[in-house]
């Protein structure tokens, strides 16, 4: 459905105002209420950030990425954890939400995992902008409690550039929530779980780290389980573990896509796999 001129004008004005606010506050260390700002920032409205549900991961999206993890400047994303005296970060990112969508999982994980830095990677421009604006508002509105300092988002293509951001064995958890199912067989190569990509995930995951997957598409669930089962560096975790892990509970209910599935009374298929030790060379 096309927008009227008035609707398009309102969307443009809203986005321009949010962009100005984003440029001002995106990299600011928000520890206390900011001067010259109202005490509360409105959370962004999704209707002004509409974009296609999925994006072609093989397209040239003109993304910015570091040549290596050593060249990544994390201080811009997590200024609260940057030590200016030593010019170093006091923590590293250890949790990644791949294809984070509108950021619902990260927001909930922020309180569940307060000692972890959590990064969402999202390829769509407007969705990334929404999450940035959401985090800015949450940080500002909870400045006194210093909450939500441990989450952020960047626009990136995890299928191409993941090792450019993360060192070997850096991550403890990776989440793949309701990824694009790519139903057509000729599109299966674009799925986020493949043999080749699993080897990259194994590289950035520490031993004992966990891959979390959830989807409402049974065919995709079976595909992900099959490929993870076949990979020598991953072992599936049982139902008892799933029932006890708080991140699984959050993953089921916190994401925007998960809430939509729940409203439609659809199924949610969950599978988690632990990163095994590297085999000893003989």
From Swiss-Prot:
Domain of life of the source: Eukaryota
User: What is any Pfam family matched here?
Assistant: Methyltransf_4
Pathway it belongs to? tRNA modification; N(7)-methylguanine-tRNA biosynthesis
For the protein in the UniProt heading, the enzyme class is transferase
Which residue stretches does the UniProt record annotate as biased composition, category Basic and acidic residues? 16-31
> Where, by residue number, does S-adenosyl-L-methionine bind?
99, 122-123, 157-158, 177, 255-257
**What is the annotated localization of this protein?**
Nucleus
The protein's annotated catalytic reaction(s) are: guanosine(46) in tRNA + S-adenosyl-L-methionine = N(7)-methylguanosine(46) in tRNA + S-adenosyl-L-homocysteine
Which CDD domains does the entry link to? Answer: AdoMet_MTases
Please give the residue ranges the record annotates as the region Disordered.
Answer: 1-31
Q: What is its main location?
A: nucleus
What residues make up the catalytic site?
180
Annotated GO biological processes are: RNA (guanine-N7)-methylation; tRNA methylation
Query: Keywords on this record?
Result: Methyltransferase, Nucleus, RNA-binding, S-adenosyl-L-methionine, Transferase, tRNA processing, tRNA-binding
**Sorted alphabetically, which InterPro entries does this protein's record hold?**
SAM-dependent_MTases_sf, Trm8_euk, tRNA_(Gua-N-7)_MeTrfase_Trmb
Q: Which PANTHER family match?
A: 3-DEOXY-D-MANNO-OCTULOSONIC-ACID TRANSFERASE/TRNA GUANINE-N 7 - -METHYLTRANSFERASE, TRNA (GUANINE-N(7)-)-METHYLTRANSFERASE
Listed NCBIfam families: tRNA (guanosine(46)-N7)-methyltransferase TrmB
Task: Provide the assembly information.
Answer: Forms a complex with TRM82.
Its family remark reads: Belongs to the class I-like SAM-binding methyltransferase superfamily. TrmB family.
| Role, per record | Catalyzes the formation of N(7)-methylguanine at position 46 (m7G46) in tRNA.
Concerning HAMAP family, the annotation shows: tRNA_methyltr_TrmB_euk (MF_03055)
State what protein this is by name: tRNA (guanine-N(7)-)-methyltransferase
* Organism from which the protein derives: Eremothecium gossypii (strain ATCC 10895 / CBS 109.51 / FGSC 9923 / NRRL Y-1056) (Yeast)
Q: What gene is this protein translated from?
A: TRM8
């Amino acid at each position: 459905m096309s927008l009227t001129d008035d609707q398009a004008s309102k969307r443009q004005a809203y986005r321009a105002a949010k962009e100005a606010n984003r440029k001002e506050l995106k990299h600011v260390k928000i520890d206390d209420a900011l001067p010259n700002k109202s005490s509360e920032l409105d959370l962004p409205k999704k209707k002004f950030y509409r974009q296609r549900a999925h994006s072609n991961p093989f397209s040239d999206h003109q993304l910015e990425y570091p040549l290596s993890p050593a060249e990544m400047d994390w201080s811009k994303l997590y200024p609260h954890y940057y030590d200016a005296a030593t010019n170093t970060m006091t923590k590293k990112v250890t949790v990644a939400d791949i294809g984070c969508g509108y950021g619902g999982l990260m927001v909930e994980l922020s309180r569940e995992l307060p000692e972890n830095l959590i990064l969402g990677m999202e390829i769509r421009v407007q969705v990334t902008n929404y999450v940035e604006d959401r985090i800015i508002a949450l940080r500002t509105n909870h400045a006194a409690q210093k909450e939500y300092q441990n989450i952020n988002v960047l626009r990136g293509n995890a299928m191409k550039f993941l090792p450019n951001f993360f060192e070997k064995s850096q991550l403890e958890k990776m989440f793949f929530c309701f990824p694009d199912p790519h139903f057509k067989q000729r599109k299966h190569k674009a799925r986020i779980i493949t043999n080749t990509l699993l080897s990259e995930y194994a590289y950035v995951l520490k031993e004992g780290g966990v891959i979390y997957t959830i989807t409402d598409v049974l065919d995709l669930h079976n595909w992900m389980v099959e490929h993870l089962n076949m990979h020598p560096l991953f072992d599936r975790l049982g139902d008892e573990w799933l029932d006890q892990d708080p991140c699984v509970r959050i993953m089921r209910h916190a994401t925007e896509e998960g809430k939509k599935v729940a409203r439609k009374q659809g199924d949610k298929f969950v599978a988690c796999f632990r990163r095994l030790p590297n085999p000893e060379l003989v």
